[in-house]
Structures are given as C-alpha cells and as structure tokens.
C-alpha cells in the first residue's frame, strides 16, 4: 500500500541542491509525483514535493536525512485517514 504526502522544502540557491533532495527521496523508496516551486527569493527557492511512499520506515528515514541536510522543511499533513501514519511519524520530530 502506498501513501501520499507533501513536503515543503526551502532550498538555497546552490548548484545541484534540487538533484540532491530528489535523490534522497528516491533512495528512500519514495516516488515524486509532482514538484511545484511556490516561492523565490534571492537566497532560496521553496518547493512542494508530492511524494508516494510505501511505509513508515522509509518515511522516517527520509525525514531524518532531510534534517541532516539542515534544510528548512515541513510536512503538509493530509486529512484523509490513509495519511494518518504521517501524523504518527511527525510526533517524533521537532518542527523546524
């Protein structure tokens, strides 16, 4: 069973950073189903990544790896029951 989540991530203006984040997502067995740039400033770009992910372990690993990159991010919670697993994971992480 796959779950859908949206990650909002602020990426600094650095060559290769979008590729690095996309690779992190893929390495955790998640599929990017949509990317949207929502904000642009001189220092950063804000992207929304809609992802499909197979299980809680992969989601937890992905969030940990994003935190290790020192990126400002948040997970947008979906209100449908099938996304409730994401809410359980978020209780274990401090908000940025």
Q: Where do the language-model regions lie?
A:
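A conserved regulatory-domain signal marking ACT and ACT-like small-molecule sensing domains
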Residues: 1-96
């Amino acid at each position: 069973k796959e779950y859908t989540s949206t990650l909002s991530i602020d990426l600094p203006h650095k060559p290769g950073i979008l590729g690095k984040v996309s690779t992190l997502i893929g390495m955790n067995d998640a599929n990017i189903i949509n990317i949207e740039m929502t904000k642009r400033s001189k220092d950063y770009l804000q992207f929304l990544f809609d992802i499909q992910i197979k299980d809680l372990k992969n989601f937890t690993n992905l969030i940990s790896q994003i935190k290790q990159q020192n990126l400002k991010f948040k997970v947008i919670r979906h209100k449908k029951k099938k996304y409730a697993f994401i809410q359980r994971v978020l209780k274990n992480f401090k908000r940025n």
